[in-house]
A protein has these predicted regions:
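Amphipathic alpha-helical segments in well-ordered regions
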Residues: 1, 24, 65, 84-85
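Carboxylate- and glycine-rich phosphate/diphosphate-binding segment that chelates Mg2+/Mn2+
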Residues: 1-54
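Catalytic-loop motifs flanking and including active-site residues across diverse enzymes
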Residues: 17, 58, 77-81
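Short alpha-helical scaffolding segments that buttress acidic/His motifs in well-ordered protein cores
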Residues: 18, 40-48, 82-85, 125, ...
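Short acidic (Asp/Glu) and glycine-rich catalytic loops that position anionic groups and cofactors
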Residues: 21-22, 59-63, 102-107, 129-135, ...
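Glycine-rich phosphate/pyrophosphate-binding beta-alpha loops
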Residues: 49-75
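Gly/Pro-rich interdomain helix-loop hinge
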Residues: 68-147
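Conserved small/polar residues in nucleotide/adenosyl-binding loops
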Residues: 165-166
Length: 166
């Protein structure tokens, strides 16, 4: 939704995806049913349609070495630094020059998550990740950034389309 390549259509797909997944994700993980599995499949399809237009962003490009080097599942790896990337982009939104009103996009995201701003948003994402039992502590995941930094940097997939706001 904040990718420079996003447009009204991708934002519509992403918004619909988030409306569904926000309400179904944790229940799907905790007590899978045909209903919430169907909802998550629909959300996934809508998200894929949005990404097909807007392309992936920095958290996705950075995820690959965490999967290949440390066996962190791809989706989990994408989420490892999501709040940090999102917060950075929010705090630097005035330095970005997208073809759309970036503040309105952030406000839409905050509205979808029923939060009041960036701090509430990052807290809510952290809570969702905790409820999903997605570990963020790199030490707990046996990831030593300093020791592995060269391999991590080499593993970042620059061929994947990356068009975050910065």
């Amino acid at each position: 939704m904040v990718s420079k390549k996003s447009n009204d259509q991708s934002v519509e797909y992403a918004s619909k995806s988030l409306r569904v997944s926000i309400n179904s994700y944790i229940s799907f993980l905790n007590d899978p049913s045909l209903k919430n599995a169907t909802e998550m499949a629909i959300a996934s399809n809508l998200a894929g349609m949005a990404i097909n237009i807007s392309k992936t962003t920095a958290p996705h490009a950075v995820s690959y070495p965490f999967t290949s080097l440390f066996n962190v599942s791809h989706g989990h790896a994408v989420g490892l630094f999501f709040e940090k990337f999102f917060s950075f982009n929010y705090k630097n939104k005035d330095k970005s020059e997208p073809s759309f009103d970036l503040k309105k996009r952030f406000d839409l995201i905050f509205n979808l998550f029923d939060v009041q701003g960036i701090n509430d948003f990052t807290s809510k994402i952290s809570l969702i990740k905790k409820q999903a039992k997605l570990e963020d502590n790199l030490q707990t995941l046996n990831i030593n950034i300093k020791q592995s930094s060269d391999d991590i940097i080499k593993g970042i997939n620059l061929l994947r389309p990356v068009s975050y706001t910065h």
